[in-house]
Amino acid sequence: MIGGEVSIKNVSKFFDDFQVLKNVSLDIKKGEFFSILGPSGCGKTTLLRVIAGFEGVESGDVLLDGKSILNLPPNKRPVNIIFQNYALFPHLTVFENIAFPLKLKKLSENEINQRVNELLSLIRMEEHAQKMPSQLSGGQKQRVAIARALANEPRVLLLDEPLSALDAKLRQELLVELDNLHDRVGITFIYVTHDQAEAISVSDRVALMNEGEIVQVGTPYEVYESPVNVFAATFIGETNLMKAEVVEVEDEYYVVESPGIGQFRCYRDKEAKKGDRLLITLRPEKIRISRKQFRSEETFNVFHGVVDEEIYMGHQTKYFVRLDEGYIMKVYKQHARYILDEPIIKWEDEVFITWNPDDSFIVEVLEE
């Protein structure tokens, strides 16, 4: 199978007086696993339905390999979509469900049998060919829905939160399977989800949406490590947001004064001048925590505080540290063998925290 290149050009869509898509533009590469991530109601499913042909638009265009498909009906587009409920035919077997689109194309029985058997092998469900959908688990139904969607050899596969109805463990297992399947078939996957972990774990690139607009597009690393604004910083993962004022401008850093924290250095990634007010983000896992004082010659940004709350998560412990000047800093400490000999940090312990100035950076220069 060969993936298609999808271009969405300045697409706007209204439902009555409500604008659900606001001049949306995206370029999705051939064979890419591309995720559209955002909260409920942000327009991501509507955008998927526009690509599939189930929704019209007020303005803009949708192109596949450089040619507009906007005026093509859904059945004429080389695109298939998988919905949240999989939409399997309950009265047909697994084999018959996968064969259904091939029968509509009036292929010969030999061609249908060959293609369906190839797809059953691809999803590793040869032994379930004669089962009814009611006899399948949620994960098996999802695989059958994917196989049926691939039967017509689409250029693009659209997936509308296909794992949302599954439990967390199965969801993670099937996400890995989906990623492996994408690698094997080579077509373009466009995956819609509100789950940040899903999007950043399997995608080549991610588009972050909010209120009908594209906020940021980039690799999972880029959107997590370099969020472009407050929404991007807070929607993907957790963070500490700190208001601060620039008190000194250095070559690489700003020295800032933050209420409830004090003075610290942050990375100079946006232009600001002395006296400007900033909003700064710092991921909790970037912060080191210890009951011992850090050597000042080795680190910047050292603060003292008391553990207000601790939450043991298995792979890490989440600490909420009340600093001497009042700010409560979220600090996530990963568990590893090499730190087992360190004193265990508990509730009400006095602690020191520190972070590299490169890990705290500006998400917004606030207006006066």
Curated annotation (Swiss-Prot):
Per the record's keyword annotation, is Cell inner membrane included, yes or no?
yes
Q: Which residues form the ABC transporter domain?
A: 6-236
Q: Which UniProt keywords apply?
A: ATP-binding, Cell inner membrane, Cell membrane, Membrane, Nucleotide-binding, Translocase, Transport
Q: Where in the cell is it found?
A: Cell inner membrane
Database matches in CDD domains: ABC_PotA_N
- Where, in this chain's numbering, is ATP bound? 38-45
So which domain of life are we looking at?
Bacteria
| Record-linked NCBIfam families | potA
Gene3D superfamilies for this protein: 2.40.50.100, P-loop containing nucleotide triphosphate hydrolases
Q: Per its UniProt entry, what is the enzyme's top EC class, as one word?
A: translocase
What species does this protein belong to?
Thermotoga maritima (strain ATCC 43589 / DSM 3109 / JCM 10099 / NBRC 100826 / MSB8)
Q: Which gene encodes it?
A: potA
Translocase keyword on record: yes
What job does the chain carry out?
A: Part of the ABC transporter complex PotABCD involved in spermidine/putrescine import. Responsible for energy coupling to the transport system.
Q: How does it assemble?
A: The complex is composed of two ATP-binding proteins (PotA), two transmembrane proteins (PotB and PotC) and a solute-binding protein (PotD).
Q: Name one Pfam family in it.
A: ABC_tran
GO MF: ABC-type putrescine transporter activity; ATP binding; ATP hydrolysis activity
The text of the family note is: Belongs to the ABC transporter superfamily. Spermidine/putrescine importer (TC 3.A.1.11.1) family.
Membrane association type: Peripheral membrane protein
Which reaction is recorded as catalysed by this protein? ATP + H2O + polyamine-[polyamine-binding protein]Side 1 = ADP + phosphate + polyamineSide 2 + [polyamine-binding protein]Side 1
Instruction: Report the InterPro entries cross-referenced here.
Output: AAA+_ATPase, ABC_SmlMolc_Importer, ABC_transporter-like_ATP-bd, ABC_transporter-like_CS, Mo/tungstate-bd_C_term_dom, P-loop_NTPase, PotA-like, PotA_ATP-bd
Query: Could you tell me what this protein is called?
Result: Spermidine/putrescine import ATP-binding protein PotA
E.C. number: 7.6.2.11
User: What cellular-component terms does GO give this entry?
Assistant: ATP-binding cassette (ABC) transporter complex
